């Protein structure tokens, strides 16, 4: 293992030297090839600067069973990057006078009359300030609910009685249910399916011929399969029925089609300037979420940042990141069909190349300790983690990837290994509620209820509106 880590380190150091001897396109390609070589990226990437595509390339396999490679026109599921498209579509209907931003949910969907969310406005749903919870309010949502097929009405019934997390308009809380609701409103006011309206108003006018709404019964030519990667192996991703992701995560597309979408937003092709500006106006802190986009400065070095509109997306076996830099009409999009991946780190380095900055190609600690876990166990892996963490000249630590590592072990029911990694994560990243929640769930799986209660309480200290932590505590206290 030490030999492989050394090889990785030497390779990355050499790449860092070579980047500046090449032109920009070659630098971008060298960068992405290094990520792919060490199992950190499979998918497609596109970079545009001043309205022109300067680099696009694909890596890895679209289908591992048949050894079919990804290409730049491979279709990927984009998860929550569907939300910017939904927001744009809804604003097109606002522009046409079919929807009003300050109208209430009950005005469009009678099923919500006399329900907690009845008075929530369209504006609040768009900006995640409605107080409508996310699906983690339901225990074991993914194994119990996400794999089922629903009609629109049936899925609305799953959450329409949910208590709001706060008074609408007073706070920010991300809610995929909120965007499913917006998709349903689009269907109600047009009398057409969300898929059809999206095609008529956005995909067809922009020539986004490789984009659409996915359902598992469809045959979609050139659509990538989704995989999970961890501990040195690829796994076929879990199934999710996309009937419960309409408006929030059911879109498939390509990097080239998303470039067309970016240009249309830049040129006000779809929306007038007033609505476009409103969409990209920063919302409530901390997320600064406008309508379908996080609108805030994106920090790509310790001292440099750029004004950006961005969104990330994650769905079974896929992870994606779409970032616009409006001041220079530039963009970066990465679509990956092996999750997880360091989408923030990749994007930061792509922007570094765009701005002629030094590329920080360091060895990722989480990748190195994966091999230690496989070969020598989690305790040894944590010992090596502590050594590599100190070597900041050659290694970097990504809290999110360390969190994903504990979650992968948990999903494989390797609870003791998961506990060791998650306990280290809790010490290293004490302010991350996801990290505390991960450890609490692992303790619960190990029947260490007192420890689980302690960390569910910590989750609520960090994030008072965590519905999953609230629900778990209620169950544990009752028991």
Give a label for each model feature.
Residues 136-220, 243-259:
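Catalytic-site signature segments of enzymes, centered on catalytic residues
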Residues 84, 399, 433-434, 467-468:
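Helix-start (N-cap) detector for alpha-helical repeat units in TPR-like alpha-solenoids
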Residues 22-57, 187-192, 196-200, 204, ...:
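Catalytic loop of the DD-peptidase/beta-lactamase superfamily, centered on the K-T-G motif
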Residues 37, 41, 50, 61-174, ...:
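Active-site-proximal loop and beta-strand segments within enzyme catalytic domains
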Residues 411, 445, 475-479:
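Register position in tetratricopeptide repeats
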